[in-house]
C-alpha cells in the first residue's frame, strides 16, 4: 500500500487551514504544508493572529506549527515534494457567462490541476477538498491525461469536508463520517486506501465511507442542500406563526421530538448564510437544469427563494415598525458574521439586511466581536449592495455594542453571539430614542422578553408575536437582490 509521508494543501482558507492543522496534530509523522498565493494570508497563519477565527484552532496550530505543520507561498516545491495534494481553493458561483448566478466557477480548480501536473513526477494522489459539481474530478483527470509525462501517475480522489464553521475543530476531530470517492480500478482503490490510512490515525474505520468519485461529489452537494432545506422549511413556518399567534420554537420542539424528523437545523432565523449553502444549492439547481430535470431544479430553487423572502420579510418588519420610515434614523446592527463563533461573512444575512436598510436611508452602526472593520466595509461596498458613497455616508463601525446602540431608534440582532444575551439592556434602553425597538433575528433573547418589555423595549422576533401594539406585517415590495448577480458597476478598490 502507498504510504503518505508528505501532504500539500493548496488553499489556506476556512477549509484547508483547519483541516490540515488537525491532520498534522493527529499524524505527527506526516509533514503537512499548506500553500496559498495570498502572501498576507500565509503571513497571518505564521503569526500569533490567525487569518480566521475558529474555537480551538489557535491551540492546534501552535502545537504543530514549525514541527510538522508549515504555511508557505512556495507552491511548486510543496507540490513536487508531496505524496498527496489536497485542492482546497474557492469555487464561487459564476457571476458572468453561461450559468451565471448558479453554476460553480471552476477556474481555480483548473489552475490547480495544471500547476500540479506541471510540477509532478512519479506517483501522486490528488484529492478534491473544495465543494465541486459532479464530475469535476473527471475534468481534473482530463487535464492530467492531456499533459502526461513518462512515469507520471496521478490518481484523483474526492474527499469533501463536512465541517461546520464555529465547530470546525470539533467536527474534524470527531467527524460523523469521512467520505472518500475514487475510481473503481485497482489503482484508484489503492489511492483510496492510502488516504483511508491517514484518517484511521484518529477516525474509527466504520466511520470512513468509500464510494465512487461521482457519488462522493454529489453527496456533498446533497448534504448541504438538505440542511439548507430544513432551515428554509422552519423559516416558512415562522411566517405562519407570526400571523397566527403560534411560537415557532414550540412548533420546532414538537416536530423535532419525532425521531423521523429530529431536532437539528430547526432553528428559525433571519436566514442562512456562509460560503456553502446558497452556492451549493444553486449549483444543484444548475446541474438539474443541465440534465433536463426542470421540476427538480424548481424544487431546490425554492429553498433559495424562501431564504431571500425571510430576509426581505425581516427588513420589512423593521421599516414597518419604525413608523414606515428609517430615513436618517440610527439603527444598531449587532453581529455581522453569518453565524456565531466565526469571522466569516460570506452570504451573511447581515449584509442583506444592511443593504435593505441603507436603500431606505438608515444610518447603520455595526458591531461584531470577530469581524474586522475592513471586512465589513468591503462586504457593504460590493457593487450589488451599495452605491458609491453609501457606505461612507451611512455606515459606522462601532467598537462595542453600547456605542452602536447609543442614540439608536432600534437595535437589530443578526448574529447569535452569546455575548448579546449578557448585555446591560437597562443601560442600552436609557441611551436609545423612545420608543426603543429590539429586532431579534436570531431569537437569542427568548428568555428575556418579559424583562425587556418591563424595561420599556418593544420586541419583534422571528416566528413569534411579542409586541401587542401592532399586527405583524408581511409586505413584498422590497426588491430581491443577490451577491451572485453580475455587478452593474466596477467594484471599488
From Swiss-Prot:
Q: Which reaction(s) does the protein catalyse, per the Swiss-Prot or TrEMBL entry?
A: UDP-alpha-D-glucose + 2 NAD(+) + H2O = UDP-alpha-D-glucuronate + 2 NADH + 3 H(+)
Which stretches does the entry tag as region Disordered?
88-110, 466-493
Which parts of this chain are annotated as the region Important for formation of active hexamer structure? 321-325
Q: Which residues bind NAD(+)?
A: 11-16, 36, 41, 89-93, 130-132, 165, 276-279, 346
Annotated positions binding substrate:
161-165, 220-224, 260, 267-273, 338-339, 442
The keyword Translocase belongs to this UniProt entry's keyword annotation: no
Q: Per the UniProt entry, what is one GO biological process? A: glycosaminoglycan biosynthetic process
UniProt modified residues of type Phosphothreonine:
474
| MF terms (GO), sorted A to Z | identical protein binding; NAD binding; UDP-glucose 6-dehydrogenase activity
Q: Which residues form the active site?
A: 161, 220, 276
Keywords, in A-Z order = Acetylation, Allosteric enzyme, Carbohydrate metabolism, NAD, Oxidoreductase, Phosphoprotein
State the family named in the UniProt similarity comment for this chain. Answer: Belongs to the UDP-glucose/GDP-mannose dehydrogenase family.
The record's comment about this protein's domains reads: The protein goes through several conformation states during the reaction cycle, giving rise to hysteresis. In the initial state, the ligand-free protein is in an inactive conformation (E*). Substrate binding triggers a change to the active conformation (E). UDP-xylose binding triggers the transition to a distinct, inhibited conformation. The presence of an intrinsically disordered C-terminus promotes a more dynamic protein structure and favors a conformation with high affinity for UPD-xylose. The allosteric switch region moves by about 5 Angstroms when UDP-xylose is bound, and occupies part of the UDP-glucose binding site. At the same time it promotes domain movements that disrupt the active hexameric ring structure and lead to the formation of a horseshoe-shaped, inactive hexamer.
Q: What does this protein do?
A: Catalyzes the formation of UDP-alpha-D-glucuronate, a constituent of complex glycosaminoglycans. Required for the biosynthesis of chondroitin sulfate and heparan sulfate. Required for embryonic development via its role in the biosynthesis of glycosaminoglycans. Required for proper brain and neuronal development.
Name assigned to this protein:
UDP-glucose 6-dehydrogenase
| Taxonomy of the source species | Eukaryota, Metazoa, Chordata, Craniata, Vertebrata
Amino acid at each position: 500500500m502507498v504510504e503518505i509521508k508528505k501532504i500539500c494543501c493548496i488553499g489556506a482558507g476556512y477549509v484547508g487551514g483547519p483541516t490540515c492543522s488537525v491532520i498534522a496534530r493527529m499524524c505527527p509523522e506526516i509533514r503537512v504544508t499548506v500553500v496559498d498565493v495570498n502572501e498576507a494570508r500565509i503571513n497571518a497563519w505564521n503569526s500569533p493572529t490567525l487569518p480566521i477565527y475558529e474555537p480551538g484552532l489557535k491551540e492546534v496550530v501552535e502545537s504543530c506549527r514549525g514541527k510538522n505543520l508549515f504555511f508557505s507561498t512556495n507552491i511548486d516545491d510543496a507540490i513536487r515534494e508531496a505524496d498527496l495534494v489536497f485542492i482546497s481553493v474557492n469555487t464561487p458561483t459564476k457571476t458572468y457567462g453561461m450559468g451565471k448566478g448558479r453554476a460553480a466557477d471552476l477556474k481555480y480548480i483548473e489552475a490547480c490541476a495544471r500547476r500540479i501536473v506541471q510540477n509532478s513526477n512519479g506517483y501522486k494522489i490528488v484529492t478534491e477538498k473544495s465543494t465541486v459539481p459532479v464530475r469535476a474530478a473527471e475534468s481534473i483527470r482530463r487535464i492530467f491525461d492531456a499533459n502526461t509525462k513518462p512515469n507520471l501517475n496521478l490518481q484523483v480522489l474526492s474527499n469533501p469536508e463536512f465541517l461546520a464553521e464555529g465547530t470546525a475543530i470539533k467536527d474534524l476531530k470527531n467527524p460523523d463520517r469521512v467520505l472518500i470517492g475514487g475510481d473503481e480500478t485497482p489503482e484508484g482503490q489503492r489511492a483510496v486506501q492510502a488516504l483511508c490510512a491517514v484518517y484511521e490515525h484518529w477516525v474509527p474505520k466504520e466511520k470512513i465511507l468509500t464510494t465512487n468519485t461521482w457519488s462522493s461529489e454529489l453527496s456533498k452537494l446533497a448534504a448541504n442542500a438538505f440542511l439548507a432545506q430544513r432551515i428554509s422549511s422552519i423559516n416558512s413556518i415562522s411566517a405562519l406563526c407570526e400571523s397566527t399567534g403560534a411560537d415557532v420554537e414550540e412548533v420546532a420542539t414538537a416536530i423535532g421530538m419525532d425521531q423521523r424528523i429530529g431536532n437539528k437545523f430547526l432553528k428559525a432565523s433571519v436566514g442562512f448564510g456562509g460560503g456553502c449553502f446558497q452556492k451549493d444549492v444553486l449549483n444543484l439547481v444548475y446541474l438539474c437544469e443541465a440534465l433536463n430535470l426542470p421540476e427538480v431544479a424548481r424544487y431546490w430553487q425554492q429553498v433559495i427563494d424562501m431564504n431571500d423572502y425571510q430576509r426581505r420579510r425581516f427588513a420589512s418588519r423593521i421599516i414597518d415598525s419604525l413608523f414606515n420610515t428609517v430615513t436618517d434614523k440610527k439603527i444598531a446592527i449587532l453581529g455581522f458574521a453569518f453565524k456565531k463563533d466565526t469571522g466569516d461573512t460570506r452570504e451573511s444575512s447581515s449584509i442583506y439586511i444592511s443593504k435593505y436598510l441603507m436603500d431606505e436611508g438608515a444610518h447603520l452602526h455595526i458591531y461584531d466581536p470577530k469581524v474586522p472593520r475592513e471586512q465589513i466595509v468591503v462586504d457593504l461596498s460590493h457593487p450589488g449592495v451599495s452605491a458609491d458613497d453609501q457606505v461612507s455616508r451611512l455606515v459606522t463601525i462601532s467598537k462595542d455594542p453600547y456605542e452602536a446602540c447609543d442614540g439608536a431608534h432600534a437595535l437589530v440582532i443578526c448574529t447569535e453571539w452569546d455575548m448579546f444575551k449578557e448585555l446591560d439592556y437597562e443601560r442600552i434602553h436609557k441611551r436609545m430614542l423612545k420608543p426603543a425597538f429590539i429586532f431579534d433575528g436570531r431569537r437569542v433573547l427568548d428568555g428575556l422578553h418579559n424583562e425587556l418589555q418591563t424595561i420599556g423595549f418593544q420586541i419583534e422576533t422571528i416566528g413569534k408575536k411579542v409586541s401587542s401594539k401592532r399586527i405583524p406585517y408581511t409586505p413584498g415590495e422590497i426588491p430581491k437582490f443577490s451577491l451572485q448577480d453580475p455587478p452593474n458597476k466596477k467594484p471599488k478598490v
